[in-house]
Amino acid sequence: MSQPERFEVLVLGSGTGGKLVAWHMAQSGRRTAVVERQWIGGSCVNVACMPSKNEISSAKVTHLARHAAQYGTVTNSVAVDMATVRRRKREMVDRQIARHLQNYKATGAELIMGSGRFVERKTLEVILNDGGTRVLAADKVFLNVGTHAALPSVAGLDAARPLTHVEALELEYLPPHLVVIGGGYAGLEMAQAYRRFGSDVTIIESGPQLMGREDHDVSQEMRRILSDEGIQVLLEAELLQVRGQSGEKVALVVRTASAERNIDGSDILVAAGRVPNTAGIGLEEAGVRLNSRGYIRVNGRLETSAPDVWALGECAGSSQFTHISEDDFRIIRDNLAGRNRSTRGRLVAYCMFTDPPLAHVGLSEGEAERQGIIARVARLPMNSVLGAQATEQRQGFMKALIGESDDRILGFTMIGAEAGEVMAAVQTAMLARLSYSTLTDTAFAHPTMAEGLSLLFSNVPPRSVQRTTTKVA
């Protein structure tokens, strides 16, 4: 092995948390290198959050155009040009990558494109994408290697060469019948988008409900919305076998509670969970331990089992959202500056960008029940919100959990137009530890979706001397 090049900071993976660490460290005067195998800026910029939301927005325009007559606008027949959809998405991604490259140049962090593997503690061998090898060593190492789509072990599935979100976002044709394996957030977003573009869509979910972590009423409402758009949903459906080739013709054998059934389709999209990118990068040589699921073991400060080595983002088992990876960066940054911040107990918010979207922050009813937390529940259908009535976006509902003893907001869920923006107001109130009555008495602008918060929180049941933990319907 050649003599290593010395850096003060070495980052493996240029995703959200990793790039922010690198730019911060480089701006602080530390010699910093970032090793990235493929996607500058990570999956969010290239093949996940940003491009998928770009495509979802195209699908929403298609949907509105097809229903324009309901709003008094007369259109001729609507056609979808998938090549233009892809070009629009690609141009957006290219702009994001250009901004990233500008940030590397401005901060002085060196971006090295290649595949890295640890050969000893805090020493990385990099096989460069354009040929050659470099060996890098650093005082501090940060791991931000992310995850990739899991492929279920099903006879014939691998041979069928199914799509993941990566390939689905590059299609320039419209699948006649898309079969989505998995009823989680990414699968539902893509299922609705392709249905709106014009595909027949079937969702196969092995569990008893869509979005398994959500409360049953939330899952039921989303299933109703998707079914109303013509998406077929199969629950408690075990995929037994796949024949054929995705992109041509596929036949799937599925076992449901009632019987086995055959599903014929044209394309398969696998959206059945994620696997950490921790194999084959020499973490054992670096002294970095993994948990039983292959994620990097970290403490609340995101420190690994190896001294001066941190992990952040999805590979560290953090919630799989870009904003949580960014928060991981802030925790590491502040702790290196002498503070004592932790990931434990942080308030996690997220959105699913279906139409209408789902937004959630804090505890769900199910989580409160499992944790033995007594909570009061307030619920409001979106049809009761004047802004929803005015715009005829009446699907969904709001729901809040309130502490029994102190009137604090414990959790909030919304399916409805602008759910993410409304949720942000509740999230801010929760961070400030405000009583729910603060929102009850707030004069929200009229007629906005957020105005519904006053109605929602006016429906909070009074405290009771004896109350059992909320049961999930």
Predicted feature descriptions by range:
Residues 2-7, 24-30, 35-174, 202, ...:
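Glycine-rich flavin
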Residues 3-15, 174-184:
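Beta1/beta-strand and adjacent pyrophosphate-binding region of the FAD-binding site
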Residues 10-12, 116, 124, 135-146, ...:
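Short hydrophobic core segments
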Residues 18, 184-187, 325:
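Catalytic nucleophile loop
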Residues 23, 192, 223-224, 366:
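Alpha-helical segments flanking ligand/cofactor-binding loops in enzyme cores
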